[in-house]
Design a protein with these regions (language model features):
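Short, charged, amphipathic alpha-helical segments
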Residues: 134-142
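Short amphipathic helical patch at the helix-1/turn junction of helix-turn-helix
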Residues: 1, 12-13, 45
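Charged, helix-prone or intrinsically disordered regulatory segments positioned adjacent to compact structured domains
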Residues: 49, 56-131
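Short, charge-rich amphipathic alpha-helical segments embedded
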Residues: 148-156
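Recognition helix of helix-turn-helix/homeodomain-like DNA-binding domains
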Residues: 26-46, 67-70
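Short basic helix-loop element that most often maps to the first helix and adjoining turn
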Residues: 5-25
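Helix-turn-helix DNA-binding elements, focusing on the entry/boundary residues of the two helices
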Residues: 7, 18, 33, 48-51
């Protein structure tokens, strides 16, 4: 998801208007909503200091905006390819045996990454069986990683 779309999604999730966000960033009354609309549409890119302030206002981890983000499957594949170049043993690809179609599984030989994936899986399972709401799931993602990580997959 591109930066502007992330800003828009989180702003709307927080029930904040473009004008309100713009005013809280210090833009004038007449230009506040216009500036935010430009950020969200990709016409303008906020400076790093502005992104930090947007994250504070929207109460999310700033990494939601500062990390480059992967907007397409092609970009995801390129990222995985370069990670594979840096560490040839990191990924293990395999065909899932229980599938009638060709579905490829991927594991990463990195304990930290696996703990992240297990944590995510735990949240998705809770979402799937109704133990958490869509809002709670998004809220968790917006604040990930927490300073004191809780591995919830053990209680699933």
């Amino acid at each position: 998801m591109k930066l502007g779309a992330r800003i828009r999604k989180i702003r709307m999730f927080r029930n904040i208007t473009q004008k309100e966000l713009g005013r809280r960033l210090g833009y004038g009354e007449s230009s506040a909503d216009v500036r935010i609309a430009q950020y969200e549409s990709g016409q303008r890119t906020p400076k790093q200091e502005t992104l930090i302030r947007i994250a504070e206002i929207l109460e999310v981890d700033v990494r939601n905006f500062l990390s480059p983000g992967i907007a397409t499957m092609d970009e995801l594949m390129e990222t995985l390819f370069w990670m594979d170049e840096e560490n040839r043993g990191l990924f293990h690809l395999f065909l899932l045996n229980d599938s009638e179609s060709e579905i490829v599984g991927i594991t990463m030989r990195d304990k930290k990454t696996m703990s992240y994936l297990l944590e995510w899986m735990g949240k998705k399972l809770k979402l799937g069986d109704g133990r958490i709401t869509e809002e709670e799931y998004l809220e968790w993602k917006l604040h990930w990683p927490e300073d004191k990580r809780k591995t919830e997959y053990k209680t699933v």
